[in-house]
Amino acid sequence: MDLFRAFSKPSSKDIAKERLRLILINDRCSMPQEVLEDIKEDILKVLSKYMEINYAEIDVRMTITEKVEEDPVALVANIPVKKVKYNK
């Protein structure tokens, strides 16, 4: 590890690479709201077979996560469950 490089400015190549990465991530995240609503409805349709859902507090969105470098775009769904239906 080169200690001097750790404190130096990033090179223009590294800056350009990071900017391109952010542009590509943003491009992947841009999805029409209608498509996201269709996905949300399909997910809720399936989940409602197995559980009662609090529809007032549902949050489904596309987001960028820094945890995964290869594919940082994620669909995040926060769906509060009231009760699990167990019918066998």
Swiss-Prot record:
Keyword match Cell division: yes
Gene behind the chain: minE
Naturally occurring in which organism (per UniProt): Clostridium kluyveri (strain ATCC 8527 / DSM 555 / NBRC 12016 / NCIMB 10680 / K1)
Any one Gene Ontology BP term: regulation of division septum assembly
Family: Belongs to the MinE family.
Designated name of the protein: Cell division topological specificity factor
Keywords: Cell cycle, Cell division
Alphabetical list of InterPro entries matching this protein: MinE (IPR005527), MinE_sf (IPR036707)
Function, as annotated: Prevents the cell division inhibition by proteins MinC and MinD at internal division sites while permitting inhibition at polar sites. This ensures cell division at the proper site by restricting the formation of a division septum at the midpoint of the long axis of the cell.
Matching HAMAP family: MinE (MF_00262)
Key word Cell division present: yes
SUPFAM superfamilies assigned: Cell division protein MinE topological specificity domain
